[in-house]
């Protein structure tokens, strides 16, 4: 929702405007259980600076504090199509997550993470569970942004043929230097190993025309070291591609 306009760029959807009018070679925003990233790239230095300005302003000065409608549009709100119609819940992310929760593959992937890492942030769904999204209030939403969308809780990477010192000085003067340091512990502790194997059974929805027969998923999951072991991570990435993802994989 931070990409729905900001103090300096009060347009409804700056992302769409950048896609249409910039020289970017990459432009996106992605959410994960433990982070959200806002990557940009351009071969033109002036364009890259413009992209930096739009994204920094979006992250640190979004219009969400001015317009509750952004939360209602992207998160959730009640709708009534007519006086006789039932009250329904609508919202961009809410509808996206309803779709994700109706996909057996997505349901299985979430259950794998939840069962392996129940005591960590990886047990959570970054987009939210549609059953619980309507429980989120506007005030809680703003409090989350104030606490976590802070320079002390961010990593900013610059890479390429540029004057890095100039970029850092601009970021400090325009944004980072205007914040006070806060104590924020973002460490993600490792999941405590289980004392014995655990079995989990979970139901997923099917259409009225589908049969329950031969429609069961079985998954065996185990934790192997951490993603910080680069060689092991790469080895299993290759193994996954060879056994599962590659054309003709068994």
Regions found by a protein language model. Name each.
Residues 2-5, 36-43, 76-81, 130-131, ...:
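Second-shell loop/turn segments in exported
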Residues 20-22, 31-35, 88, 117, ...:
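Short, solvent-exposed loop/turn segments at the edges of secondary structure
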Residues 206, 216-250:
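Structured mid-domain segments that build the active-site/substrate or prosthetic-cofactor binding neighborhood
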Residues 95-155, 175, 189-190, 226:
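Histidine-acidic residue clusters that define the catalytic metal-binding segment
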Residues 1-57, 61-62, 67-70, 102-106, ...:
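M16/MPP (pitrilysin/insulinase) zinc-metallopeptidase core fold and M16-derived inactive scaffolds
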Residues 35, 62-96, 163, 183-197:
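Acidic/histidine-enriched alpha-helical segments
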Residues 155-216:
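An aromatic/glycine/proline-enriched structural segment found at the starts
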